[in-house]
Amino acid sequence: MNVSASLTPFNTSPTQKSAPMILDTLPDPAIEGQGCPRTTRVQIDLILLAIEALELGGSEAILGFAEELELNGIIKDRVNLWRMRSTNPLRRANIRRPLTIIEAKALVVIACYLSRRLTVVIRQMLMIYQQMNDKQIPLEQNLRLSNYLERFRAHFKSRMNPRRSGFLALTSDDKIDELAINLLGKLLFCTGTAGMQRFWISLFDGEVE
């Protein structure tokens, strides 16, 4: 069974030079400077990593939605997207540049729109996980969930640097699986009422409740 869902973007109008209005739905955080804190950069990259593990064409979908939502003036191409995500200090190819607030907003908007397209898949997988966990059934016995966890582990291990301090708590497959399931919960949170705004705020003032 394939976890992938169709995420084909629609045609859009040309990008305008001013910041897209959709970004105005996310409040500017009360932080010093124009760059995002370390935790914010990590969490945004990880939520996108979970989407890539859910959707085989995740990277292309991110770029497609950037165009659809008129955010391609911010997320211009694959290299530009990689540079933004590489501000995550846990990455092997970490880039020492700030992730600006407007870049972070664009990534969060896209992540939340992708989450909405994948709501049914995310909800089903969390339900399967809960049922299997309650009955103490190994997760690998469910193909859909197993495929997601396997892809997430592969993405995580290939892109994150095990020598980074934040990696030390995630040295086992079980711990990485826990992270993957936790991120599914955050993706579902993004699909709820005012989920995008609430998730955005949580990136700066604490964990999603």
Task: Kindly give the residue locations of the regions a language model identified.
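Helix-turn-helix/homeodomain-like alpha-helical modules used for DNA recognition
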Residues: 116-200
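Intrinsically disordered, low-complexity coil/linker segments enriched for acidic/polar
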Residues: 37, 58, 72, 77, ...
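Single-residue recognition of alpha-helix capping/boundary positions
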Residues: 43, 103-106, 141
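DNA major-groove recognition helix of helix-turn-helix/homeodomain DNA-binding modules
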Residues: 93-118
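A short, Lys/Arg-rich alpha-helix, primarily the initiator
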Residues: 2-68
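Major-groove recognition helix of helix-turn-helix-like DNA-binding domains
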Residues: 74-89, 145, 149
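Non-catalytic DNA-binding core/recognition domains of DNA-processing enzymes
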Residues: 44, 69, 84-88
